[in-house]
């Protein structure tokens, strides 16, 4: 079986194609976003490119052997993409955003398990985004440097915690948050502060330190414009990685869950990728990852590493998705030294 990976680096308008599995590879057709290749036994494979290729070049495109058995590579020049924005802050904010929900006033959000309505126009009159990572950093700075004023402390302390009003929903990258009075179709448990669906008792989230209810998007489903949308649990971590890049440009993140840890190196951001079977990521991150304790400890000592904790469902789904994508890569593209290579979609 032939395996391949296509990487588009929009900043330099370069497309690299690596193919493995045939003794010979030739380009039969190359037009717009379609590349047709043939093998030594007249096998044909159509590969969908992430972007249109520049066909008028000085030399014709050809595959060259990489010095390894059955592995070939070519580099193409892409047409400039008018929709591409190289700014880090242009990276997507996630799914089920304020703008997306406001586009349909009749949207509803249900328990994924039993379809009980949790959020609808009946209990959602105001939608607001949660403050960005920058806000939380500012609050940390504020606590270290706030004035020593003894008289009227209320003018300062009222900004230290989030206090949404009744029927106001705060939208985070992978969760919704609101007051107990807003979420009438949920219940709580005293022993572990879980928030449960009132109908089926499925765990939807937790009670925060500020006594708000925090509901995970991946425990819910969105009904909008007659369509049903689910939130993949792995997106919880993917969006957190995007936020780390936006907030402080950190490229090393230690993803933790209980006793397990996965060190993720955010190698490339906002590139186009096509994998074996034409699995396509229009906007992707290239991630290198490892669970080697030796490598993790060495990196912690030498690099600035952001550490993030996640629930088991999100962690397992993210790790599984990385492994599944890695399995689609040609042999020499699966690892770099002690790091395993993978990709994840930004959208």
From Swiss-Prot:
Domain of life of the organism encoding this protein: Eukaryota
InterPro entries associated with the record: UBQ-conj_enz_E2-bd_prot
Entry's Gene Ontology cellular component terms: cytosol; nucleus; ubiquitin ligase complex
Protein name: Uncharacterized protein YJR141W
An example molecular function term from Gene Ontology annotations: ubiquitin conjugating enzyme binding
Disulfide bonds: none
Biological process, per Gene Ontology: negative regulation of protein ubiquitination; positive regulation of mRNA 3'-end processing; proteasome-mediated ubiquitin-dependent protein catabolic process; protein autoubiquitination; protein monoubiquitination; protein polyubiquitination
Originating species: Saccharomyces cerevisiae (strain ATCC 204508 / S288c)
Database matches in Pfam families: HECT_2 (PF09814)
């Amino acid at each position: 079986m032939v395996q391949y990976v296509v990487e588009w680096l929009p900043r330099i308008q370069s497309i690299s194609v690596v193919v493995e599995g045939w003794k010979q590879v030739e380009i039969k057709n190359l037009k717009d976003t379609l590349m047709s290749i043939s093998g030594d036994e007249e096998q044909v494979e159509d590969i969908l490119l992430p972007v249109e290729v520049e066909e008028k070049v000085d030399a014709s495109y050809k595959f060259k052997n990489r010095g390894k058995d059955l592995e070939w590579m070519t580099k193409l020049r892409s047409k400039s993409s008018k929709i591409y924005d190289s700014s880090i802050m242009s990276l997507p904010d996630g799914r089920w955003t304020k703008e997306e929900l406001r586009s349909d006033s009749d949207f509803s959000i249900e328990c994924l398990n039993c379809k009980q309505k949790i959020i609808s126009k009946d209990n959602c009159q105001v939608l607001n985004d949660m403050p960005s990572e920058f806000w939380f950093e500012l609050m940390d700075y504020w606590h270290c440097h706030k004035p020593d004023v003894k008289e009227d402390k209320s003018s300062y302390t009222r900004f230290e915690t989030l206090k949404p009003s009744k029927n106001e929903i705060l939208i985070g990258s992978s969760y919704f948050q609101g007051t107990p009075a807003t979420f009438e179709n949920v219940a709580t448990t005293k022993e572990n502060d879980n928030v449960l669906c009132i109908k089926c008792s499925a765990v939807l989230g937790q009670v925060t330190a500020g006594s708000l209810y925090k509901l995970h998007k991946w425990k819910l489903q969105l009904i909008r414009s007659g369509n049903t949308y689910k939130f993949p649990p792995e997106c919880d971590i993917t969006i957190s990685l995007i936020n780390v890049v936006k907030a402080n440009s950190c490229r090393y993140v230690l993803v933790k869950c209980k006793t397990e840890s996965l060190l993720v190196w955010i190698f490339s951001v906002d590139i186009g990728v096509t994998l074996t079977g034409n699995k396509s990521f229009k906007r992707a991150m290239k991630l290198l990852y490892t669970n080697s304790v030796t490598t993790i400890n060495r990196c912690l000592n030498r690099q600035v590493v952001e550490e993030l904790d996640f629930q088991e469902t999100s962690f397992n789904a993210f790790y599984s998705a990385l492994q599944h994508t890695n399995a689609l890569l040609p042999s020499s593209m699966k690892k770099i030294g002690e790091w395993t290579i993978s990709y994840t979609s930004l959208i």
